[in-house]
Design a protein with these regions (language model features):
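N-terminal catalytic or cofactor-binding beta/alpha core of small enzyme domains
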Residues: 1-123
């Protein structure tokens, strides 16, 4: 399994997915985590799993459809380029199944690690 991680360590509001990545990797050595730039092309697996900052949520949450981010959303992907690229891949038919593990920008580090870990492998 591969999980893509989006984020920008230079922007505080978008840095948490990158900051927690070493701990998540330690918890799940059998999973391949890859930091990706939303503006680059990526191989799209049958099920694309992404960890990214999501504005407008108070807790770590899983999204299984891009419809939650379209129009005038109640929540929005922090990085518009990620959303635009994902919609493009969906339109091309290359995006079959998606899971976005949304991380609020201001959640506590340890809480984020715990919540994401529980979503990756629920107990």
């Amino acid at each position: 399994m591969t999980i893509y991680v989006f984020g920008n360590p230079e922007i505080e509001a978008d840095s948490l997915p990158i900051k927690i990545l070493p701990k998540i990797k330690e918890n799940f050595p059998e999973i391949n985590f890859e930091i990706k730039d939303p503006n680059e092309e990526w191989n799209v697996p049958e099920e694309l799993i992404i960890i990214d900052t999501v504005l407008g949520i108070d807790d770590v949450k899983i999204f299984d459809d891009l419809k939650y981010f379209s129009g005038a959303p109640k929540v929005s992907l922090h990085d518009f380029d990620a959303y635009a690229n994902l919609r493009y891949l969906q339109k091309l038919g290359r995006l079959k199944k998606i899971k976005i593990i949304g991380v609020p920008p201001m959640i506590d580090y340890d809480k984020a690690v715990q919540k994401i870990s529980n979503l990756i492998f629920p107990s």
